[in-house]
């Protein structure tokens, strides 16, 4: 049976969405941040073990055997190539794709705002993002806490120092023993504790910025020069929903390449296929990435929260079931 042809969101809701997108663009115009447009597909993709990509194949002239292509999970790699080419501060509002969940807060194809500020570190970027959130959400000044403090305050355990057994005991108190007890990977266990135990307890009245994530979860962020246990990475939560993920961007090509290779090793150990590494990005880092910070923000979730709805379908014209 076919689903209805009509949009999930009303025209009134879509006009409200358009108004917020205009607000966001004006925010960056006022700060002289250039809007850019990068490919939705690439020959390479992310290696992160927690991200699942859509894959297709180009079979045009010169590619009789097919050229694998991946839909981008974010525009990060292409935008960093622009930064290395001298673009200066840039932002993009685009479609991103993740072959994962479909539901209240997830759609396989979603709208992302990503921006990079040359000369900023992650604290500077949190300051700027706080201003944007106050404007769009009509919220107060965000609260800030380290990843370590969030765990200690909410769960009574230290994510940087406590043993796996202690972390599993915390999971047991949340009724997660069946998932946590067999888990051997520390970061997977920490992410379980954070998503189930911490997220719902922070950022209820105003958005919460959580920063200084474990170095093992650095992804594309720099390691903190004053504490090698943590990375210059932050995430943003509001009313139990993850809104954004930001970095003081890593600019060392060999370290970034090693992280990608380590991810692929981990993927193989987990029974997942290794992913093709984006060597264009590595070459761009070799050419020189300016000191900068960047963040990716989920637009659909932001608009849903700003307008007081409880499902992203309420602010999306044609979500996955109707697409």
Curated annotation (Swiss-Prot):
Gene Ontology CC terms: cytosol
Alphabetical list of SUPFAM superfamilies matching this protein: Class II aaRS and biotin synthetases
Record-listed substrate binding positions: 74-76, 116, 249
An example molecular function term from Gene Ontology annotations: tRNA binding
EC number: 6.3.2.-
Enzyme class, first EC level, given as a word: ligase
Catalysed conversion reaction: D-beta-lysine + L-lysyl-[protein] + ATP = N(6)-((3R)-3,6-diaminohexanoyl)-L-lysyl-[protein] + AMP + diphosphate + H(+)
A Pfam family the protein falls into: tRNA-synt_2
Gene Ontology BP term (one): lysyl-tRNA aminoacylation
The keyword ATP-binding belongs to this UniProt entry's keyword annotation: yes
Keyword Manganese found: no
Binding site for ATP: 98-100, 107, 242-243, 298
Keywords: ATP-binding, Ligase, Nucleotide-binding
Domain of life, source organism: Bacteria
Family (UniProt): Belongs to the class-II aminoacyl-tRNA synthetase family. EpmA subfamily.
PANTHER family reported for this sequence: ELONGATION FACTOR P--(R)-BETA-LYSINE LIGASE, LYSYL-TRNA SYNTHETASE
Described purpose of this protein according to its UniProt entry: With EpmB is involved in the beta-lysylation step of the post-translational modification of translation elongation factor P (EF-P). Catalyzes the ATP-dependent activation of (R)-beta-lysine produced by EpmB, forming a lysyl-adenylate, from which the beta-lysyl moiety is then transferred to the epsilon-amino group of a conserved specific lysine residue in EF-P.
Subunit field text: Homodimer.
Record protein name field: Elongation factor P--(R)-beta-lysine ligase
Gene: epmA
